[in-house]
């Protein structure tokens, strides 16, 4: 059992400043004014306006070595559950009793200064206090258990955890409508490598192209050890293999809008009846049908998380110096460069650039690395 510690955790400052009264003497009669009875100091701000601290319990360490802060709660009055989806300030939680609860989040969890955009994410394991005699059943989330295997992105400089407690990332792209974006695959692969989750590359709508034309792309990723699945939600091609890859795992499905994420999941389990919409013929871009990440239990064990479509994906907590280490094909050449801090872009005697020139390293993948590196360098300067 993990060793428990206690630490002092910071809380966010109150969002609103207390207004200063401008009419404190308006109701007084000047002739009856007793200056001796008036207070000498007006208190403008209380402790709530300052950075607050509270003792929280710490159990063990995360994979990244960060201590997960947990509030002490009365566990005997709580149930355990998993968050199915988050909608605004409410979370849909599947309790350990098999019941679904509509839960609010304890305010102190929302004010913990964690740097996260939202306190709760789909897939979170939580301790919640049920509210008696409510229909539908309601509860209050008291504690969020330590996470592992998260899919996060950067939104306005803050970490947005899209889903937590996963062990597989299914990256869904389409051959056409919308067009295939290998660079988005590479970004999501970096996210998977960073989060230590197994990536699964799913190429949907292969009925719109000749499979032979995709072999160079499929071969590039397969040689690096990635599993690549050509699929068609329309014809059912490859869907059985996709279902076997999901069985018994906690998988998040991510990709652009319109690539057919929800359509593929509907083929696997029609009872989910996920909403789908055709691609816009004007822009050739997908339309959002999934607005919140939602957890869907699988009958064969495990679960999948359908996520809203992404057109751009900004990496979270990846510095430019780390990017090359998350490219499996570039990694073997890093130690062969002349300079230990080589960025593999302009330096002399760079083993990575030499491998590209000799054809040992895919040129498109190298261009994708350079583009991602430039994006991360710009973010670091902002």
Where do the PLM segments sit?
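Canonical P-loop GTPase G-domain recognition
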Residues: 198, 207-259
């Amino acid at each position: 059992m993990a060793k428990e510690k206690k630490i002092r955790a910071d809380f966010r400052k109150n969002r609103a400043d207390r207004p200063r009264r401008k009419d404190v003497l308006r109701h007084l009669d000047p002739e009856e004014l007793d200056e001796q009875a008036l207070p000498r100091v007006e208190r403008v701000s209380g402790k709530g306006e300052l950075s607050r601290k509270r003792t929280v319990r710490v159990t063990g360490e995360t994979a990244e070595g960060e201590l997960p802060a947990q509030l002490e709660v009365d566990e005997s009055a709580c149930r355990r559950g998993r968050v199915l989806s988050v909608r605004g300030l409410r979370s849909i939680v599947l309790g350990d009793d098999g019941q679904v609860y509509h839960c609010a989040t304890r305010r102190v969890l929302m004010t913990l200064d964690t740097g996260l955009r939202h306190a709760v994410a789909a897939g979170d394991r939580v301790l919640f206090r049920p509210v008696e005699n409510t229909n539908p059943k309601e509860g209050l989330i008291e504690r969020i258990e330590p996470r592992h295997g998260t899919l996060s992105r950067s939104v306005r400089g803050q970490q947005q955890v899209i889903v937590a407690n996963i062990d597989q990332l299914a990256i869904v792209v389409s051959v056409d409508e919308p067009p295939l974006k290998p660079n988005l695959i590479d970004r999501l692969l970096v996210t998977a490598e960073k989060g230590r989750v197994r990536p699964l590359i799913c190429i949907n709508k292969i009925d719109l192209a000749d499979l032979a034309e995709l072999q160079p792309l499929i071969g590039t990723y397969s040689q690096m050890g990635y599993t690549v699945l050509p699929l068609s939600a329309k014809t059912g091609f490859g869907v059985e293999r996709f279902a076997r890859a999901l069985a018994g795992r906690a998988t998040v499905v991510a990709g652009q809008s319109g690539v057919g994420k929800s359509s593929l999941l509907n083929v696997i389990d029609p009872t989910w009846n996920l909403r789908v919409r055709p691609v816009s013929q004007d822009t050739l871009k997908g339309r959002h049908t999934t607005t919140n990440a939602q957890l869907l239990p699988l009958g064969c064990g495990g679960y999948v998380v359908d996520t809203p479509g992404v057109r751009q994906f900004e990496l979270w907590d990846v510095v430019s110096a780390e990017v090359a280490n998350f490219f499996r094909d570039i990694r073997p050449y890093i130690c062969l460069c002349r300079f230990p801090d080589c960025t593999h872009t302009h330096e002399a005697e760079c083993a990575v650039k030499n491998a590209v020139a000799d054809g040992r390293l895919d040129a498109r993948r190298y261009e994708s690395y350079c583009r991602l590196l430039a994006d991360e360098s710009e973010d670091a300067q902002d």
